[in-house]
Swiss-Prot record:
Residues 40-71 form a propeptide. Keywords: Amidation, Antibiotic, Antimicrobial, Cleavage on pair of basic residues, Fungicide, Membrane, Secreted, Signal, Target cell membrane, Target membrane. This is Non-disulfide-bridged peptide 5.5. Antimicrobial peptide. Is active on Mycobacterium abscessus subsp. massiliense (MBC=200 uM), a rapidly growing and emerging pathogen associated with healthcare infections. Also shows antifungal activities. Has a weak hemolytic activity on human erythrocytes (10% at 610 uM), indicating a low toxicity (therapeutic index (TI)=3.05). In addition, treatment of infected macrophages reduces the bacterial load. In vivo, treatment of M.abscessus-infected mice causes a decrease in the bacterial load in the lungs and liver. The lineage of its organism: Eukaryota, Metazoa, Ecdysozoa, Arthropoda, Chelicerata. GO terms for biological process: defense response to bacterium; defense response to fungus; killing of cells of another organism. It comes from the Eukaryota. Belongs to the non-disulfide-bridged peptide (NDBP) superfamily. Short antimicrobial peptide (group 4) family. Residues 1-23 form the signal peptide. Expressed by the venom gland. Its main location: secreted. The modification Leucine amide is found at L36. It is found in: Secreted; Target cell membrane. GO terms for cellular component: extracellular region; membrane; other organism cell membrane.
């Protein structure tokens, strides 16, 4: 009975190791395929950065208002 219990525990441990290592190996494989694969630059959305440059600088009146607000 002890031997069967030990074999069961060892089998459970090995199955856990196998399932966890499969997840790690798939994550590593996905990372390598992203690093070594062809990057698709045709569908790159650069329009998201246009909003950064459309905004005017903060005016002196706005700065004065913010300074008064934070006193």
């Amino acid at each position: 009975m002890k031997t069967q219990f030990i074999v069961l525990i060892v089998a459970i441990v090995f199955l856990q190791l196998l399932s966890q290592s499969e997840a790690i190996f798939s994550a590593i494989a996905g990372l390598l395929s992203n690093l070594l694969g062809k990057r698709d630059l045709r569908h790159l959305d650069l329009d998201q950065f246009d909003d950064m440059f459309d905004q005017p600088e903060i005016s002196a009146a706005d700065m004065k208002f913010l300074q008064d607000l934070l006193r």
